[in-house]
Amino acid sequence: MSTTAVGNNEGTELISSSEQELEHIQNFHGKYPKQLWYLFFSEMWERFCFYGMRGMLTFFMVHQLFMKEDEANLQYGATQAFVYAFTFIGGLFADKILGFRKSLFWGGLLMITGSLILAFDPREFFFLGISFTVIGTGFFKPNISTMVGALYKKDDTRRDAGFSLFYSGINIGALLGGYACISIGKGELFGGTVPENLRWNVAFGLAAVVMTISLITFVFTKRSLGPIGLSPLKDPLTPGVTGEKTKGKKWMMYATYIGSLAVVPVIMTMVAKTEYTDWFMYIIGPVTLIYLIYEMTKYSAVEVKKLTAALVFIVFSIIFWAFFEQSGGSLSLFAANNLDNKLLGTLEVDPNGVNNAANSLFVIIFAPLLGLIWIWMSKRKIEPNTVVKFGLGFLFLSLAFYIFYYTRYFANMQGMTSLDFFTLAYLVVTFGELCLSPIGLSIMTKLSPKALQGVMMGMWFLASAYGQYAAGILGAGMVSPNESASAAEKLIAYTDGYKQLSIYALVAGVVLIAISPLVRKLMQEVK
């Protein structure tokens, strides 16, 4: 009896201490908490690794693995779909077992392993390396975003600005990795230094180096996070957790680690054969939705309405990413086949590097500015609500794809068109993305109960998985059926597809803005 009482007293003191520590973190002064900067740099280097490899995939598959263009588009969509689908699984294990910190660290180790395998022999071990990266990203990505959300109280108006800054960190990494990795692989960067037969090895090896920097950054700054991200088996702020309850639970953590390694051969097989991806995507979505509905039964009607609103955002984000992610598929091949290498008439650059990096550069420039604009508008009570912001994102995307389509009118007889207009389209894409993606990360944390935040963040990225999957299908449909088609014929095929996407994006934006009053009611007090 006395032992239990002492244990309860110790638990109460621990909870009180953790609550005070969290309160201190959330009551920061200024625009951003210092912990945001630590997570910013860790995420920046991880995104260098991720986007560096993402930018190489389609080009590498066509020119090094000698896949057909439509096959490479489908393969790209399948690979990226698995990457984002596993963010849901990673969020689930983080919520229930590992906690955000351990999940992030384990994911980082797996990503480093995958990059090193690809650096050793990217042609022979392509799918093995990609499989490690798929699983690693699933454990890493949703959890660092959730920890950013935990730095803020639910009603803190600075949250959107914080996520916008964090998003610019993502894009600094994407800019550097997106341009550097593929340019090294193609020999456009350090071509005179790196031997031709080792260029792709070095490109993938660079991804491993920067991922290691990301992990080291997190390890040396994680203490500043206080109770944020601790395992739910140990976190004193988790309801029902006591010292007695956590005893003997370590096997669950070890089982998670071992299980994630055991599924590598399964993932390798499924990623290599896109028909398996089809079945996976047919199953994972309905199963995830059923699981969420089950979890929703545990909450009040008010919380259920908020989660329903979150699902509306998730559905429309699938459509958005299906269009946006042409950047890694059809637009990558369009850049390789149909763009000149002159920017602003004088600068000679790699068109694929521009395709991978232009959007990120524009986000770096405009994300902080847009965050400040949202704050300025909020203070004057003229800020558009979150649903309208989403709708505006689609309208910008529609305009961008019309510009991609319009590049056909600047092409020469050989089918080579203007890199300047292509880059202009990415500027417009950026405004669309900034209306949706950083706000989307923020709204998931605002609409979700604490116990479901990891799962809902995972669902947000699962929506990206379906978007990536659809992007591969859309990109494959744009490819000319004649593999020996000229550059001019490929130009017509791709730009016809971009015109269709422009129309679809316009319709989606108008519909979303039209239903915004209904969605706002579901969101309750959340803005």
Where are these regions (language model features)?
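Conserved MFS/SLC helix-loop-helix module at the cytosolic interface between two early adjacent transmembrane helices
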Residues: 87-123
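Cytoplasmic membrane-interface "Motif A"-like loop-to-helix N-cap segments
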Residues: 96-108, 303, 376-395
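C-terminal ends and interior cores of transmembrane alpha-helices
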Residues: 109-127, 391-414
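Intracellular loop-helix junctions on the cytosolic face of multi-pass helical membrane proteins
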Residues: 1-34, 154, 182-332, 336-343, ...
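Short amphipathic helix-loop junctions that connect adjacent transmembrane helices
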Residues: 53-73, 186, 327-353
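Hydrophobic core of transmembrane alpha-helices in multi-pass small-molecule transporters
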Residues: 44, 114, 125-140, 314, ...
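Central cavity-lining transmembrane alpha-helices of secondary-active solute carriers
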Residues: 77-94, 141, 175-177, 357-372
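Glycine-rich segments within core transmembrane alpha-helices of 12-TM secondary carriers
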Residues: 83, 158-186, 203-214, 258-261, ...
